[in-house]
């Protein structure tokens, strides 16, 4: 299985970049996007501990919605990492549709700091949606 990761820097002046890892074990067999190695999650996020949370990309104008995993710096809040507005928005897009099922402070759970990666299977449909993210 192939995976596509978008590195989302906390610094909005830096561009979002895409990275593909090929021929990996699928999630149902215990696989996933690699943590170690070249372009692994630790390298892309620039940290030693990662928390994986659900996130989504939504483009209302294009009618696109893509659910995926957001790999975040787990220690970022403790070490004063910069707020990642773009990754926080992806967390918001995931949580907003279920707002009525969440606690009133649910938006606090959208706050992401440091560099992050949005990871999805590298299917043809997902690649097309991800291209629109990179073009925006």
Model-derived features with residue positions:
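Domain-length accessory/inserted modules outside core catalytic folds
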Residues: 1-136
């Amino acid at each position: 299985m192939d995976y596509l990761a978008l590195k989302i820097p906390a610094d909005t002046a830096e561009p979002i970049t895409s990275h593909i890892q090929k021929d990996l074990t699928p999630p149902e067999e215990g696989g996933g996007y690699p943590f170690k190695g070249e372009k692994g999650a630790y390298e892309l996020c620039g940290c030693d501990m990662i928390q994986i949370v659900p996130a989504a990309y939504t483009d209302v104008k294009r009618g696109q919605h893509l659910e995926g995993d957001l790999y975040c710096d787990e220690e970022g809040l403790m070490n004063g990492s910069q707020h990642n507005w773009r990754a926080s928005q992806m967390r918001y897009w995931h949580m907003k549709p279920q707002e009525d099922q969440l606690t009133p402070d649910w938006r606090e759970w959208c706050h992401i700091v440091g560099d992050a990666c949005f990871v999805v299977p590298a299917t043809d449909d997902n690649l097309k949606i991800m291209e629109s993210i990179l073009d925006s």
